Design a protein with these regions (language model features):
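Positively charged, low-complexity intrinsically disordered leader regions
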Residues: 1-23
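Conserved phosphate-binding/catalytic region of the ribokinase-like
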Residues: 2-6, 183-218
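Residue-level marker for buried hydrophobic side chains located in beta-strands
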Residues: 8-10, 148, 171, 197
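Conserved N-terminal subdomain of the carbohydrate kinase-like
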Residues: 16-21, 25, 44-124
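Short catalytic helix/loop segments, enriched in acidic residues and glycine
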Residues: 24-40
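Anion (oxyanion) recognition and catalysis
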Residues: 39, 66, 142, 191
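A short helix->loop->beta-strand "cap" motif at the edges of active sites that frequently abuts
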Residues: 43-44, 143-147, 192-196
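Conserved beta-alpha-beta core of the PfkB/ribokinase-like small-molecule kinase fold
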Residues: 124-188, 203-206
């Protein structure tokens, strides 16, 4: 039974992290992770929408999503490589190496139709990010009344923020700086349109800004 009456949808990236030092692979990607952790926390409904390749890596990700009972009814499977990235551990830190830029997902633009948008309207918000290749569809989603959660990671340029933030309802980023610098960054983000902005800062914890007050993780 669900703990939370919340419905979420991840739209965009699915990848597999290939750990070269251990010869293990793990499913991931911002949107897949959102679905997986939401399901583990007990949301009522978690769905993933995106493109899979036609290789063994794609089948592995699909099998994990099915095992977690995450909806994939709006996904498509295309001929070609699934997204992957190679990584290893060095002094306890994860170091990323080669990656294939999303595989078929990076080569195939999303074009949402009215049925896709109707499906998205069934959830409380749709999560995507700056590695999802979904930028061209954000305005269409916003105009349809869909709440958008967007992860800018730690490498989005100011120009990218100006382009994307106005369409986002909730904005997330990774930020390495002082408390004051983080707060200034979140203020700037919300001034562009999002109702909420949150910065994750590793061991320093997260800071959330709702346009009026700051909330810090202790």
């Amino acid at each position: 039974m669900a703990k939370y009456n919340t419905k979420v949808l991840g739209f965009g990236d699915n990848v597999v992290d290939l750990y070269e030092h251990s010869h293990m692979m793990y499913p991931g990607g911002n949107c897949v992770n959102l679905c997986a952790y939401s399901k583990m926390f007990g949301v009522e409904r978690a769905a993933y929408m995106g493109y899979f390749g036609s290789d063994d890596i794609a089948e592995f990700v699909i099998s994990v999503l099915n095992e977690l009972e995450i909806e994939t009814v709006k996904c498509k499977q295309l001929v070609g490589e699934n997204g992957w990235s190679k990584c290893t551990l060095r002094d306890g830190d994860r170091i990323f190496g080669d990656y294939n830029e999303g595989g078929v997902r990076g080569k195939t633009p999303y074009i949402l139709d009215r049925f896709d948008l109707d499906y998205m309207k069934e959830v409380d918000f749709v999560h995507t990010g700056n590695y999802c290749y979904t930028e061209s569809q954000l305005k269409v989603m916003k105009e349809a009344g869909i709440k958008i959660s967007f992860d800018f990671s730690d490498d989005s340029t100011e120009e990218y923020y100006k382009q994307i933030a106005p369409d986002a309802t909730y904005a997330f980023c990774s930020f390495d700086g002082t408390d004051e610098e983080a707060e200034d960054h979140l203020k700037k983000i919300t001034s562009m349109g999002p109702k909420l902005a949150m910065a994750s800062r590793g061991a320093k914890g997260c800071i959330l800004y709702d346009g009026q007050e700051f909330f810090a993780q202790k």
